[in-house]
Structure formats: structure tokens, C-alpha cells
Amino acid sequence: MAGTATYEAQPSPTPADQNSHDLFSYETTYTFDSDFQESKLGHGNSLYNDFSYDHRFLITGKWYLRLGVEYERYDFDGTDNGLPDKLQAVYGHIAFEYVVKDFPGIGIELDPGVYYQEHISGDNFDIPIKAFVSFPLKKDKIFAVVGLGWSLFQDPPVAPGGGIIWVFSDKLRLQAVFPKPALIYEPNDDWQLKLLGELNYLGVRTDDVVSPTEHKLDLHNAVLQYSEYRAGVQIGYTGIKHLKLIAGAGCTIERDFDFFRAHQSKRTDPAPYVRVAAEVKF
């Protein structure tokens, strides 16, 4: 005689994790030659390279611990005016984030490392900190972003950031968020077009600066905040699984060597730039 059928309640399936866990990125940006605003400093150009790798560890829900490493470097060529010929930084990433479909909505990040010119010492150590939170102003359409950053080698040491994200449609959105605002158009799943502005900067402690033309730049272990203000166009291609290829060009409006503690700032005229970059996520 057949037994009575029994049923066991099955636990509901765990929602699939829609976020990438391994994140690689590489960028190189070349700014062509332009004159310094003080003619006695001559002219110069810059080459920027950046590599980073991060891994996200799921904590619970959509909260993650992200750990990684990054190397940044600027190389400068042109007139021998005593300004640094390179700036470098090697640092870690320690971040706690709330992530939805690979977009962090809340986060705090520490970047402990050495920020230097040529030689590494204890004086080069810094722990920049940045934190942000985003929240909806109009559901699925308009979002506000509020951020704050701190670093020993920047002026001011505490600086605000943030702005507005406005989603006009599935294909067009405005990310008016400082320091990298952009208007983004995505005609399909494979292509992305950006009109962008950006402030890219790095604060370091330099070696001795000795200038043959500007003795106010004769400085010992000075703190330098180097900045590039850019505006341009960028194209991204994501038709290859896990890979995004990026090419861009535009104008570096100004490059600024700011020895803010010595009250010396040396700026350049505008010059064109070109960029190639790649991102891998899986």
C-alpha cells in the first residue's frame, strides 16, 4: 500500500550576487606640451599612468569590504626649471561599501601608503580618507551625492565633493558629481559616450627642489599638490565579456604645481590630451 506523500518546506533561494568581486583598471593619459604662465619656467608636458586592483568581500546583503592596491605616477618633460620630473604614489585600499549592480551608493575608503617623488621615507606616508553617501530625491530619476575627503598632503586638508545624478532615460544620464562630472549617453549595451570634466590631483612630499630660474622654489622636502583640470570626450566599449576599453581626448585646461605651504604655485597654459584605459570586472 503506497505511503502518504510528504512535503518539506524548501528555503527560498538566495538572491544572486549582481556585483563584481575582482576589479582591475589601467589608465594612461598624455598631456601635450604647453608653456608655463611664468615664461622663465619654459614649457612642459605630462604622462600619467595608474594601475589598481581590488577584491570585494561580501559581508551581508549588499555590504562589502573592498581591499586593494594602487600605483599612480606622473612623469614630466620639458624645460629644466627645477620642478619635479616625476611624482609617485603606492597605496592600499580599505573600503566599506554598499553596492548595487556594481555602483557604490554609500562608502568610506582609506588609502594608506607612500606619496613621494623619488625616495621613500616615513615623511612620505599619508592616509587619505574619502566618504560619500547617495540618496534619491526623485525615485529612480534624481539622486544627490554628498562626499568629503581628507589628506595631510592636500589644501585644504578637508574638502567637500558631491553633486546630482539625473537619469533622463535608460540611455542618457547626467552625473554632475565633483570632481568628475559627466554627461553619459549609452545607445546600446556595448557602447558608452561621455562628455566629461575632471579634476585629477595627487599630493606628495617631494625631494629637494632646486630651481636655476626661480629661487623661491628652492625647497627642502616640500609638500606638493599637483593638479590637472581637464575637459573632453570619452568612448567606452563593453562588447567583450568582463572587459571595458576606453579612449578619450580633450583639453587639459591647466596643470598646477602648488607648493601650498611655501605659497608657491606654478601653472601652465592649456594643452590637448589623449587617454587610453581598460577595466576588467568579474
Describe every region a protein language model picked out.
Residues 71-82, 179-253, 258-265, 272-274:
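Outer-membrane beta-barrel translocator/channel fold
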